[in-house]
Amino acid sequence: MLTAMKLFNKIIAPLLLSAALVSCGSSSDEVDPKRPIFSPLDTTTMTDVQKYVQNYFGKKFNVDIRYNYEDRLASNLYKLGPASEAQALKYLNLMRYTFFEVYEKVAPKGFAERHTIKQLVLFGTLGYGPTQNLLGEAPFGMIQVYDINRLTIPYLGGDDLSGFNYYYERARDNYIQTLYHESAHTLHQDTPVPEAFLKLTISDYQQDNAFSYWYVRGISSLTAGFISDYASKSPEEDFAELYGTYMVLLPEEWEQLMKKADHKYKPDSRYTGREILERKLAIMKEYLKANYHLDIDVVRAEANRRICAKVNLPSAEYYKFVKDDFSMLPPSYYSTVPKD
């Protein structure tokens, strides 16, 4: 079984060693509806993949996706490379199966269309910067996901055990978790994070020192009530990281993280990190039900069912996850796409 310790090291250690690989690099995730971001596509010159994007993701889920490199959409602060269409298709199929279809099946009707990703741009490489390398960012609400060209969907029949575990963790933690993290930002933009959530760790948010603060002191941010170092950047990132991480971890993996958090950050701290995290989670659950009629545990169970795997023997559900060739257009595409 994937251990929480391995998962924690997988997420946190590379961040520190590379001066922070982070999933959300913008100081503002707010959507400006009047800001023109995309130019209309010429449908007469679309590839099959572009038609799949428009007719499935665009029309069904109200999301605008671009994967062809456009310099005007790339950050001026980071070096970015283009995503290949083959890798973009693989990512789109992964996103469809582990994200949009999860909400479509168990969330309230219309939730995915109104409260998830609206604008998505894919780049092939990491966002290479002078002090940090990014997995993605969200400038002006336009979510950007990087490193698409290195996405691999593992299959035990084709990978040895160590290779399977490595690629599985990368797919889950670097790509799927990022989708849930970023979608959480759309929720708190509509309805602010509850004040009770903010007060729990209001004095411990580190802003731009979110990574170095814990590393230099040799302290686990879990004990301070943060699910990751990056969660300590701000209340908004705290909310999004908690949402995204809780959504993709199996219950036993979550419990192992809670055991690591079951200590006090400071000798005079009133609560352990576990107590703070469990209180934050309870507040989040209440917030989601009250404002969006969303039961995060129901959504999480469906997400887990689709993406769960065990170290020694992937489950039957995981084989369902990889039974379709994610490098190909889905069969439904050919029966639904309008004929030119």
Residue ranges and their predicted role:
Residues Y205-K285, K289-L294, L313-E317, K323-D340:
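Metalloprotease/metallohydrolase-associated module, dominated by Zn2+-dependent proteases
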Residues D29, L89-L151:
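Auxiliary, metal-adjacent structural segments of Zn-dependent hydrolase domains
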Residues A19-S23:
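C-terminal motif of bacterial Sec signal peptides marking the signal peptidase cleavage site
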Residues L179-S221:
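Short helix-loop boundary/capping segments
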Residues S162-P194, A240:
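Active-site recognition of the HExxH zinc-binding catalytic motif
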Residues L2-I12:
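Bacterial N-terminal signal peptides that target proteins for export
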Residues L77-A86, L161-R170, N174, G225-K233:
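Second-shell loop/turn segments in exported
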Residues C24-A112, R270, L277-D340:
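Acidic/polar, low-complexity intrinsically disordered N-terminal segments immediately downstream
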